[in-house]
Design a protein with these regions (language model features):
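Conserved core of the sugar-phosphate nucleotidyltransferase
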Residues: 112-174
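Cofactor-binding loop segments of dinucleotide-utilizing enzymes, especially the Rossmann-like FAD-
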Residues: 8, 53-54, 107, 131
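Conserved N-terminal catalytic core of the sugar/cofactor nucleotidyltransferase
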Residues: 2-5, 31-101
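N-terminal nucleotide-binding beta1-loop-alpha1 segment
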Residues: 1-19
């Protein structure tokens, strides 16, 4: 199992905090968001990573190589980070997966290591972690059928039909 971490974005909504620091290197209780993400994967036995960078990529590369020198981490640059989104970054990561299973993660989310464990032990081929709570307009909502097959994932889908919010951690089986 591999992990693909998307860390190319500018995070303009967090300015001035992200003026000189990538969002994933912002600290929460003394630990960066990226550090928390990597540690959650490592604690679940995943040590093969691809990080798609873009905005202030050298800061991300320097941080990761200094703090995780023994991990197998590759970097791909999304040179078009200012005009593209996560889908393009995922497209750039396609060759890394090489037909193997992988978990996709945004670099700027807070989540428990238990979510990774649940993704790894789930017997379904492709799974998506979600949060069940009262939904608003901004959440990325999930609509599924009665067998839990995902029918739609979107910010603009019906709140009434949605079963939860995507937390940004899908596992893909190749």
């Amino acid at each position: 199992m591999k992990a693909v971490i998307l860390a190319a974005g500018v995070a303009s909504r967090l300015r001035p905090l992200t003026e000189n620091t990538p969002k994933c290197l912002l600290k929460v209780n003394g630990k960066t968001l990226l550090e928390r993400t990597l540690d959650n994967f490592i604690e679940n036995g995943i040590t093969d990573f691809l990080i798609v960078t873009g905005y202030l990529q050298n800061m991300i590369i320097d941080f990761v190589t200094a703090n995780y020198p023994k991990l197998n981490i590759k970097f791909i640059e999304n040179k078009d980070y200012s005009t593209t989104n996560n889908i393009y970054s995922l497209y750039l990561a396609e060759s890394f997966a090489g037909g193997e299973d992988f978990i996709l993660s945004d670099s700027d989310i807070l989540f428990s290591k238990d979510i990774i464990s649940a993704l790894l032990t789930n017997n379904n081929p492709d799974v998506l972690a979600m949060n069940r709570h009262e939904l608003g307009e901004e959440e990325i909502k999930i609509i599924s059928d009665n067998e839990c097959n995902v029918l739609e994932i979107s910010k603009v889908c019906s709140i009434e039909k949605a079963v939860g919010e995507s937390v940004g951690l899908p596992r893909f089986v190749q």
